[in-house]
Amino acid sequence: MSESIDFYDFERLLDKAYEELPENVKSHKSRFEVPPAVVTIAGNRTIIENFVDIAEAMNRDPSHLLKFILREVATAGTLEGRRVILQGRFTPYLIANKLKKYLKEYVICPVCGSPDTKIIKRDRFYFLKCEACGAETPIQHL
């Protein structure tokens, strides 16, 4: 091997990689946290008081998250203001599990584990595009 080859040192390569990252990934200093669901059962209805806050923390459209929850618990429901009213009695534990499932399937990148993703449509297919690593993973359309 020739001695004249100029190899990048680790620090310069690291700086170059950091410059290539999107701004929202660079500025992501805090840990990704989704607020726990505030669930109230009133009669034969279940109310998720902070539903829009949860959707915003996941960086998802509340209507997409609502559609997922309604399919998972097989019921009807409506978005009223910042809360959701579901027909039927559902435990806070069940709601939390459904939110975790949504996170796993529609938010967290399966390649690098980053929450910095968005849902994109290409032709008839939907993909989870990671803004941190650039991976595109096909997802099921709701």
Swiss-Prot record:
It comes from the Archaea. The keyword Protein biosynthesis applies. Disulfide bonds: none annotated. SUPFAM superfamilies: Translation initiation factor 2 beta, aIF2beta, N-terminal domain (SSF100966), Zinc-binding domain of translation initiation factor 2 beta (SSF75689). The keyword Protein biosynthesis applies. It holds the Pfam family eIF-5_eIF-2B. InterPro entries: IF2/IF5, TIF2_bsu_arc, Transl_init_fac_IF2/IF5_dom, Transl_init_fac_IF2/IF5_N, Transl_init_fac_IF2/IF5_Zn-bd. GO terms for molecular function: translation initiation factor activity. NCBIfam families: aIF-2beta (TIGR00311), PRK03988.1 (NF003067). eIF-2 functions in the early steps of protein synthesis by forming a ternary complex with GTP and initiator tRNA. Heterotrimer composed of an alpha, a beta and a gamma chain. This is Translation initiation factor 2 subunit beta. The gene is eif2b.
